[in-house]
Amino acid sequence: IPPPTLKNDMRRLINNEELSDVTFIVDDKPVYASRIHLAARSEHFRALLFGGMKESVSGNVKIQISDVPYPVFVKIIEFLYTDNVTDIAPDIAVPLLMAAERYLLGRLKGLCEDSIRKSITCDNVISLYLASHRHRATGLKEICLDFIIDNLDTVEKSRGFHVLKDQSQICQWKLLWREYQNGKFQTAKFT
């Protein structure tokens, strides 16, 4: 029996102009896709492409995307075609997480959280925690809190900790640490 080829076949369709019927313009660059495939994989794209909006007309459609950077949007298309993403670079992980939230792609959001978890440092954990809070990335928020608890002495001395504009957040972290040390830690207070 020959090995399965579906994933590789789908990967060859990513950004394939010849087999596309929708073109997204992102940062003045085209991203080619198949409307039926996007609609099958995403409620957001189904509504956009077949929900009665001007984008839902037949023929090759062009859609301007102005709020997602090109490398992030290409990763979204890769995910929609393959149910996975290769090599989430640290510089696009948080924007990709935000886009996954916007486009209602729960699995992609989880993949981003996992990728970010692997790159957390004492210098970036505070900004990642704040981003997770803004974008309702509960899994990432818990990962950040665990990292902060395990490394609070170092995190507290980091540049990331001291750039917080709201001093009450610094006090919250100190109280969190004291409660943790005294066995009274409750995550819900800080999420």
Regions found by a protein language model. Give the residues of each.
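Canonical BTB/POZ domain core
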Residues: 2, 8-121
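Generic detector of well-ordered alpha-helical segments enriched in charged/polar residues
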Residues: 7-14, 46, 50, 74-77, ...
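BTB/POZ-protein C-terminal extensions
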Residues: 89-98, 102, 111-114, 119-191
